[in-house]
Each structure stands twice: as structure tokens, then as C-alpha cells.
């Protein structure tokens, strides 16, 4: 009986919260080229709790790799179709630089099965590459920090 009540409550939550039931996106992987200064780190902040709701608390911290490639992955444990995000440079708990321009926007409803339809993805500089694998539910986002951005250390 308790299990049935929980299922009904969950179904009501989905209806009233506007959550679209898709169950396809499982994880988002990031690969960002950014030559940072000592002590700086690259994070992903965004419009959903998995990316801190635009704050560092709960955001996705990327990890430095050889060649100034920052990588990270965020597991998505709920159904989402749309979110916005930006890359930021952080040092000692303070955001030093936000990715310039408008927010990056991901609308999974507009991505084709081969994962190459960019009508569902928007990047201000048009210097991101997106690959969505419907079979394993993984979205890979690759980004090159622009050389002329003040947060970039050439």
C-alpha cells in the first residue's frame, strides 16, 4: 500500500511541477580547454540543481588534465529536457570570471537521434561541440575558452 501511495504522489508531482518524462539523459560530460593561472579552477554553473542553480554550492567542478583540458561529469538522476549553463573560473571560493555572452542552452527535445542537430543547443561564441548519445544517455560538451576572454591566460 505504501509503495502505491508513493507512486501516485510521484506521478502527481510530475504533473504539477511541469517535469517532462523523458528518462533519456543520464550524464553530461564536459571537456574545456582553458589555460588558467595557479589556484584557479573551472566550474560549470547552471539553471538546474545539478549545476548549483547558478551558484558554486552544488555546481560541477572540472578537473585539470594535461594540455589545459578541464574535464568533469555530472550524473543526472531525474528527467530533464532543458537547461542553461555557463563555465566560470573560480579561485578560493570566489568566481573570478564568467563565460562571456549569453547562456549556453540545451534543449534535448530538439536533438536528433544521431546527436548532431544543433538546433537544440546554443552557444554564444559558437565554439562548443556537442555530441548526444541516445543509446547510453550521455551528452558530451566540448568548449574552447576564447583567447580574447579576460579569464583566459595565454
Model-derived features with residue positions:
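N-terminal edge beta-strand
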Residues: 23-24
Amino acid at each position: 500500500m505504501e509503495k502505491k501511495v508513493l507512486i501516485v504522489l510521484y506521478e502527481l508531482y510530475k504533473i504539477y511541477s511541469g517535469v517532462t518524462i523523458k528518462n533519456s539523459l543520464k550524464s553530461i560530460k564536459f571537456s574545456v580547454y582553458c589555460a588558467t593561472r595557479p589556484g584557479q579552477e573551472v566550474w560549470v554553473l547552471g539553471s538546474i540543481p545539478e549545476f548549483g542553480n547558478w551558484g558554486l554550492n552544488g555546481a560541477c567542478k572540472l578537473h585539470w588534465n594535461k594540455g589545459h583540458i578541464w574535464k568533469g561529469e555530472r550524473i543526472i538522476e531525474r528527467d530533464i529536457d532543458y537547461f542553461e549553463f555557463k563555465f566560470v573560473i573560480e579561485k578560493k571560493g570566489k568566481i573570478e570570471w564568467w563565460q562571456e555572452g549569453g547562456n549556453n542552452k540545451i534543449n534535448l527535445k530538439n536533438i536528433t537521434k544521431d546527436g548532431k542537430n544543433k538546433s537544440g543547443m546554443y552557444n554564444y561564441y559558437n565554439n562548443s561541440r556537442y555530441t548526444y548519445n541516445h543509446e547510453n544517455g550521455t551528452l558530451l560538451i566540448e568548449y574552447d575558452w576564447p583567447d580574447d576572454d579576460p579569464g583566459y591566460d595565454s
